[in-house]
């Protein structure tokens, strides 16, 4: 772990709802700069800024359209550089959220990958070899591009999975992690990291860090190898840069390139607990099965809540 991380107190910022300086109703990087003294006054000396790269924002910025551009709603790259400088002058480190597992379907890499003719980005994403092929257990989309193939998704339809390879090969269209196309994906992500670190960023909180490689082994052998490779680069070129993993497995992540693990227990859908009736919506008590907190038959309906608290 980096020495500065041992004393770090992080303040997480969701940019769009933090502080708006231009009156458009959306928070921005200048708003973060304006509140640095406030943040420091709370005793915090590090920031984790949720996704702020260019995006259509179909998934809160976790669908990146351009890794090297700040989203227009938040400002400019010049604003990012100004934020790094202002924060450092106050002894505050700044980490950006990095989403290496997928891009937006509007990313230029993906647009090129969709073309039927072979090009540099044809295998930057995971494609089957036929528009009628399934995803071998992974979610997929077909029939929407000129290319004869279906593409693998990580989460939503708008988030095609970047190709880091497969740990276990089941289909002829699946590539091993040492395939040149998969190696190129790793190098492209290193290039993104260098871009922001050169500007003054202090590191990254890495989204879905444990699941880059598909069909990986139980101990994430191939994904771990990628992160050790990236850490080797950072140790040489940016020795003070921090990596924080969304992994939920510190015994694994800390041995494979990460300084800290973003460790959270995964919970259920909070909205469903409040509003939707389904088995187990409230808890395991037999009297509560199929009753959500704010539904009329729960004894804690919304009317009672409104009458007593508003």
Description of each model-found segment:
Residues 16-17, 38, 63, 93, ...:
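A generic short-segment signal for beta-strand/edge and adjacent turn/coil regions
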Residues 20, 105, 213-215, 254:
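Short, function-defining helix-loop hinge/capping sites that tune catalysis or transport
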Residues 105-140, 231-232, 236-310:
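Conserved alpha/beta catalytic core and glycan-binding cleft of carbohydrate-active enzymes
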């Amino acid at each position: 772990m980096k020495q500065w991380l041992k004393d770090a107190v992080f303040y997480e910022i969701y940019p769009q709802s933090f502080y708006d300086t231009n009156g458009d109703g959306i928070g921005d990087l200048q708003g973060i700069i304006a509140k640095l003294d406030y943040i420091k006054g709370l005793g915090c000396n590090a920031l984790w800024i949720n996704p702020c790269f260019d995006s259509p924002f179909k998934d809160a910025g976790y669908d990146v359209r351009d890794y090297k551009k700040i989203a227009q709603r938040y400002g400019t790259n010049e604003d990012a550089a100004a934020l790094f400088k202002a924060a450092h002058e106050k002894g505050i480190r700044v980490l950006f959220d990095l989403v290496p597992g997928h891009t937006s379907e509007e990313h230029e890499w993906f647009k090129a990958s969709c073309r039927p003719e072979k090009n540099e980005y044809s295998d930057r994403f995971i494609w089957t070899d036929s528009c009628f092929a399934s995803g071998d257990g992974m979610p997929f989309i077909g029939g929407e591009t000129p290319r004869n193939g279906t593409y693998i998704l990580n989460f939503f339809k708008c988030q095609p999975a970047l190709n880091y390879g497969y740990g276990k090969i089941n289909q002829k269209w699946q590539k091993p992690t040492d395939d040149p196309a998969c190696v190129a994906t790793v190098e492209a992500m290193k290039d993104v990291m260098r871009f922001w670190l050169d500007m003054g960023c202090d590191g990254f909180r890495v989204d879905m860090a444990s699941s880059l490689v598909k069909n990986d082994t139980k101990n994430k052998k191939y994904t771990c190898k990628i992160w050790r490779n990236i850490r080797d680069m950072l140790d040489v070129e940016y020795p003070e840069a921090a990596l924080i993993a969304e992994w939920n497995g510190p015994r694994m992540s800390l041995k494979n390139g990460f300084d800290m693990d973003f460790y959270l227990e995964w919970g259920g859908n909070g909205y469903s607990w409040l509003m939707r009736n389904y088995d187990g919506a409230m808890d395991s008590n037999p009297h509560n099965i199929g009753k959500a907190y704010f539904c009329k038959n729960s004894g804690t309906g919304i009317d009672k809540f409104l009458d007593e608290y508003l």
